[in-house]
Amino acid sequence: ATNLQLTLARHPPALHGLGPLSNYLRRQSMVTVVDQLLMGLRVAWLCQSEAMWAELAFEARAVGLGDREIRQVAGGPDAGWGDWDGTVLRAADEIYRDSFLSDDSWQRMATRYDAQQLLDVIFSGAEFIMLSMMANSFGVQPDDRFPDRFPVDVEYQPLMARSASARLSEARLEPIEREDWSTEVRELLDPAGTGGAVLNLYATLARHPTFFRPRAVQSAYIRTGATLSDRDREILILRIGWLCGSEYEWSQHVRVARRIGMSADEILDVAVGATASRWSRFEADLLRATDELHHQDTVSDATWSALSNRYDTGQLIDMVITVAGYRMVSIALNSLGTQLEPGRPRFPDVARQ
């Protein structure tokens, strides 16, 4: 077990909730191992997670990458890579910075990867962001058995500010229409045979049934198995959806927030952030933690200490998992171009900071 896994073992339900998707993406993904490791190393560098860098560098050496290539990852996609490897690293940069895979990267990757592999690419990059956020926030140290550390002769250069470009007006991957469902897809989307409406997100991810199942386990854990209150969870999810520019995620969770009793003004103030006057000190700290996780890929000591006055270890772990998990979902929704169902709530007219 890695140090991150041993840390998560302090809260076993979380380990079980995250395990199936992590295992799929790391061990069964349809993306080549080298492409995964290039993305993972690049994301670990961008997130400044030395624990993840050390682990992935160890794996990279096992598949033939050497000192030069591993160091070169820190230099980014323009550090002398060939066309394909540069595309993979650029995709990692975009997913991290913009929560979105650009048209150019999508088109380039589609020359080699099919729809299921593209799903795996997007979620693999987002998974490495999630793991790095957790390792940073929990203070996980590099394992002694992984000797690599960050290259000391490469200066860390933060990427330019995240793009505010408009999201896709058409889906890159369309939801599967009911008349085209296979038996396997029907068992995933409508196992009881009720004929009810299926969200566009689910009908899109069902294009990859092998991936759909472990992802559903993680989603169910965050939504129903974690230790956070409904209100705390929805504040976190709405805020990270807003920060990532995922209108679909925002829209779906506005509906959830309404069902659990949050008012329209409270939902609006999630977009305003921690400075809105209506929040309790604790709720402002939740929003602040989300902002820190999005912008710095970790929770500051001050915010962690403040949250620790109310949250126990399991809740602190679940707080980070919730934000990181829905950052992953936002990246996927944006990159797939998943469109809102008719009549659903849109983003509020609130200036972005």
What are these regions (language model features)?
Residues A1-Q353:
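Hydrophobic alpha-helical segments
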